[in-house]
């Protein structure tokens, strides 16, 4: 097994692109291990409905990235207090779905620090009832990776805020995340532990006393990783557009009237829109409903679709920004 450095990159779109690139393009006769740390971001499972997993208003206000990964499972929050690890190897027939095989050295490293960690259920590492690590896998032909999070010292308030869904009724066939009590590993340590030291302890558990052999990515590798990031992980189509069909319902009682929004959304675009309420406006809201059909379901695109319409004409004295926020 060889170790791959990510050059301390914290851009989640690059780190996920690097992981996929290594899986699909590096020499298959080798196995690889890598770490990466992301700036504040939500990493959504491959089969999830992104809008159902995130508090979009909050993450927009706090510049939190949302990126879809190629493995299944639920949405997770990453920040610089969270260490991600990934084993990339062949599926020998006994590896895919075998979370114990890949989490065992991680659990051993934690136990060496006095943390009473164990693999529980299908894919979580816990201390008692508290989850400190979630794991997921993906397989491409005969190659696979098993990757996971290690919450050393994450901002737990942000974990709750960023993953709290907006107060909308969204019904879809996406895979919903299961929320558990989460905790930082630091809570179970007697002394502070820096992430760089944590990395060394894990590497020693995996490689033993032998020198850690490193596989260095070339300039060409990094160019290809950047291209994959641009073409896939930085696109709305990948991160949001893969959403299954869903029904969006939201309502709010403003000082000047009640407004209810109902959208049918498919692959991120509004297919059908209805607006109800007891507001006092002159215009026929059918104009707005028609303007919204085909629009991407997010604040920016709804704002653009309605840019030529005077919403006061339709809703009376209700704030334009608040109306568009309600729709998104």
Swiss-Prot record:
Species of the source: Staphylococcus aureus (strain Mu50 / ATCC 700699)
Name of the protein this chain belongs to: Lipoate--protein ligase 1
Lineage: superkingdom: Bacteria
GO molecular function per UniProt: ATP binding; lipoate-protein ligase activity; lipoyltransferase activity
Position of the signal peptide: none
Gene Ontology biological process: protein lipoylation
EC code: 6.3.1.20
Residues at which (R)-lipoate binds: 131
């Amino acid at each position: 097994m060889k170790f791959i450095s990510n050059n301390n990159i914290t851009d989640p779109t690059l780190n996920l692109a690097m992981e996929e690139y290594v899986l699909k393009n590096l020499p298959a006769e080798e196995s690889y291990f890598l770490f990466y740390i992301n700036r504040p971001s939500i990493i959504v499972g491959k089969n999830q409905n992104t809008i159902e997993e995130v508090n979009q208003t909050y993450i927009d206000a706090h510049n939190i990235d949302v990126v879809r990964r190629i493995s299944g499972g639920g949405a997770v929050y990453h920040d610089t207090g969270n260490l991600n690890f990934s084993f990339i190897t062949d599926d020998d027939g006994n590896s895919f779905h075998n979370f114990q095989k890949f989490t065992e050295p991680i659990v051993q490293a934690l136990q060496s620090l006095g943390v009473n960690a164990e693999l529980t259920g299908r894919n979580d590492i816990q201390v008692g009832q508290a989850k400190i690590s979630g794991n997921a896998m993906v397989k491409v032909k005969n190659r696979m990776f098993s990757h996971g999070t290690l919450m050393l010292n994450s901002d737990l308030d942000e974990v709750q805020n960023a993953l709290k869904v907006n107060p909308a009724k969204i019904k879809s066939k996406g895979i919903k995340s299961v929320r558990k009590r989460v905790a930082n590993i630091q809570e179970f340590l007697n002394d502070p532990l820096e992430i760089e030291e944590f990395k060394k302890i894990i590497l020693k558990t995996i490689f033993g006393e032998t020198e850690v052999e490193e596989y260095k990515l070339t300039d060409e590798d990094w160019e290809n990783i950047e291209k994959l990031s641009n073409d896939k992980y930085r696109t709305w189509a990948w991160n949001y557009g893969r959403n299954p069909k869903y029904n969006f319902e939201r309502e709010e009682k403003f000082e000047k009237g009640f407004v209810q929004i109902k959208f049918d959304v498919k692959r991120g675009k509004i297919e059908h829109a209805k607006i109800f309420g007891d507001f006092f406006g002159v215009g026929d809201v059918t104009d707005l409903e028609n303007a919204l059909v085909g629009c991407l379901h997010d604040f920016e695109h709804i704002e653009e679709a309605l840019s030529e319409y005077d919403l006061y004409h339709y809703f009376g004295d209700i704030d334009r920004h608040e109306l568009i926020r309600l729709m998104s």
